[in-house]
């Protein structure tokens, strides 16, 4: 593996799952066939790794490996990690969908909230489980469902608002069966949410934001300058068009109007398995990146909104179309905006970077900052308030944690 201006690299190695079975043909994925993954619950066996920083600068990782969720921490920006803690003891049928991964968030006092999904049957009906740690990650409460409803739930997103309340959103199919029983068609799932004011121990009753969302794409979650949740998601618009939408909450319990991010006109009766990424800058600008294969445009795109998500700029193409750009991530960090995504040149997968220092008005030229010759997880971005980092799990080269450096 080659890292341009490599800042940090762990000595840990990993095995990442090969191409996942049963994915829709529409999915853009760079996971290629290889030998079976190892079955241990160690980071080197992880298929998905999610980072989060605590208020003291501690880096936390949550990962899937061996049918279990595990957590470890680093006090030296990823150079070394603590002994891992298994959040789940028995092996579970964890949601291995391309956009599924454990979610971890840390509050101002160091409390940890964690959520993940499992499959409950062979029809891929899911269940969102939640847990928390109140002792600095040394132990976690037994996982339990986020809602008592037994309909399928997947693709959760969680985060702490500035006051320390956990906000959780997920895709939920509870309204599908009643609609069909009444002779009505019901496409996709619904966007639901709940909140926890005790650090993730208990959650409020689930409430709906919108029906007929795409059922298989991750959510983008951020908080605006007022501490209100903002959720980006792939919606199902009239005619079966699966384009992206966004909703801003007036408070933790009051979702606002759903607005369209872009008119890509991707009409597809299948699962794209490719959700958006959302960040909100200190200026209050919404920044969204996404993938589409629509009639109006194809590939990765970026747009911004300066009116609270009501309207967005014309989509800006991202990446080289002939290299299948995929899995975009964007973050508003201390040095401005950073955006990463994956490309595949026929031999290797690279992580590419663009940065902006004027709130998205202009962007640097794309440059590759990492590559690998085998399967890999999505590239993720995380910030400790002083530095932005790339977090990337690879099969051949292990887990890597790399500082995003300024343009040369």
Predicted regions located by residue number:
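N-terminal secretory signal peptides that target proteins for export/translocation
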Residues: 1-6
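Extracellular, repeat-based ectodomains that mediate carbohydrate processing or recognition
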Residues: 27-408
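Bacterial N-terminal signal peptides
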Residues: 9-22
């Amino acid at each position: 593996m080659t890292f341009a201006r490599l800042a940090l690299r762990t000595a840990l190695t990993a095995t990442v799952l090969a191409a996942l079975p049963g994915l829709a043909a529409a999915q853009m994925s760079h996971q290629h066939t290889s030998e079976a993954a190892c079955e241990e619950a160690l980071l080197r066996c992880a298929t998905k790794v999610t980072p989060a920083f605590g208020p003291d600068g501690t880096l936390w990782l949550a990962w899937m490996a061996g049918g279990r969720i595990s957590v470890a921490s680093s006090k030296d920006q990823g150079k070394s990690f603590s002994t891992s803690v298994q959040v789940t003891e028995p092996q579970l049928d964890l949601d291995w969908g391309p956009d599924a991964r454990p979610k971890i968030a840390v509050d101002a006092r160091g409390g940890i909230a964690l959520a993940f999904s499992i499959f409950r049957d062979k029809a891929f009906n899911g269940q969102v489980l939640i847990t928390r740690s109140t002792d600095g990650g040394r132990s976690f409460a037994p996982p339990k469902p986020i809602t008592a409803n037994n309909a399928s739930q997947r693709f959760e997103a969680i985060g702490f608002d500035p006051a320390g309340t956990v906000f959780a959103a997920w895709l939920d199919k509870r309204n599908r069966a009643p609609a069909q029983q009444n002779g009505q068609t019901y496409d996709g799932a619904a966007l639901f949410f709940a909140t926890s004011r005790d650090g993730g121990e208990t959650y409020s009753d689930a409430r709906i934001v919108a029906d007929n969302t795409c059922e298989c794409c991750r959510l983008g979650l951020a908080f605006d300058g007022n501490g209100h949740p903002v959720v980006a998601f792939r919606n199902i618009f009239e005619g079966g068009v699966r384009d992206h939408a966004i909703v801003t909450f007036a408070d933790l319990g009051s979702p606002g109007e759903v607005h369209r991010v872009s008119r890509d006109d991707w009409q597809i009766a299948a699962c794209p398995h490719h959700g958006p990424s959302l960040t909100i800058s200190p200026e209050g600008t919404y920044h969204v990146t996404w993938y589409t294969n629509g009639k109006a445009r194809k590939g990765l795109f970026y747009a911004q909104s300066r009116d609270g998500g009501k309207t967005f700029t014309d989509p800006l193409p991202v990446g080289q179309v002939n290299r299948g750009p995929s899995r975009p991530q964007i973050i508003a960090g201390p040095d401005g905006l950073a955006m990463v995504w994956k490309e595949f040149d026929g031999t290797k997968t690279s992580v590419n970077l663009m940065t902006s220092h004027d709130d998205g008005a202009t962007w640097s030229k794309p440059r590759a900052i990492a590559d690998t010759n085998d399967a890999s997880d999505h590239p993720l971005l995380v910030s400790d308030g002083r530095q932005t980092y790339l977090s990337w799990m690879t099969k051949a080269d292990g887990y890597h944690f790399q500082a995003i450096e300024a343009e040369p």
